[in-house]
């Protein structure tokens, strides 16, 4: 018998796809409400939730520009930050008893990985042109092309698996960890495990965001040696 955590959505429909879809929609609504609230009455001197969001935004851009440069960090911030917030809240909602993290479903993480995969290729082709972009797949010298091209293709497709399974595996493991802790101490609020899971939720969102930036940077920045 499949042992599953209780969820409020499961009371409506026990189907797993419905539960994941319900929590995905819930996370999206929460993000929209927060974004609306933060930008409803914007002030020159920020305060409250506007101050929190501006601190987070400036922190993300500041960190990303050290890795991919300021131009890429700012230009692709909307996509990278949206994914980061979606992943974080998608992870964090599963920590609350009665809710399930949509990121614990491989279908959810696969969609995010595919969005990043197709987007960075699209941006790479738009920035460099089709021929020049795929020329980078051929290697530094023409006679290495038969070897380098399939290696590059496999490398790029492996990013889909890497992005989706890393997030899925970690959050699925967190769910099992939470299940075990609640079985061992159902009447005691496990503060330490919840703190660990919150940190892991933040870490996974950060990793996904940085990899998104790195993949886009690798696609759009022209290598002068080629």
From Swiss-Prot:
Keyword entries, A-Z: ATP synthesis, Cell inner membrane, Cell membrane, CF(0), Hydrogen ion transport, Ion transport, Membrane, Transmembrane, Transmembrane helix, Transport
GO biological process entries: proton motive force-driven plasma membrane ATP synthesis
Entries under Gene3D superfamilies matching the protein: ATP synthase, F0 complex, subunit A
Protein name: ATP synthase subunit a
HAMAP family: ATP_synth_a_bact
Role: Key component of the proton channel; it plays a direct role in the translocation of protons across the membrane.
Subunit structure: F-type ATPases have 2 components, CF(1) - the catalytic core - and CF(0) - the membrane proton channel. CF(1) has five subunits: alpha(3), beta(3), gamma(1), delta(1), epsilon(1). CF(0) has three main subunits: a(1), b(2) and c(9-12). The alpha and beta chains form an alternating ring which encloses part of the gamma chain. CF(1) is attached to CF(0) by a central stalk formed by the gamma and epsilon chains, while a peripheral stalk is formed by the delta and b chains.
Cited Pfam families: ATP-synt_A
Highest rank taxon of the organism: Bacteria
Lineage: Bacteria, Pseudomonadati, Campylobacterota, Epsilonproteobacteria, Campylobacterales
GO cellular component term of the entry, any: plasma membrane
MF-aspect GO terms: proton-transporting ATP synthase activity, rotational mechanism
Transmembrane segments: 18-38, 44-64, 79-99, 105-125, 137-157, 177-197, 202-222
Topological relation to the membrane, as annotated: Multi-pass membrane protein
Stated family: Belongs to the ATPase A chain family.
Location of this chain's protein in the cell: Cell inner membrane
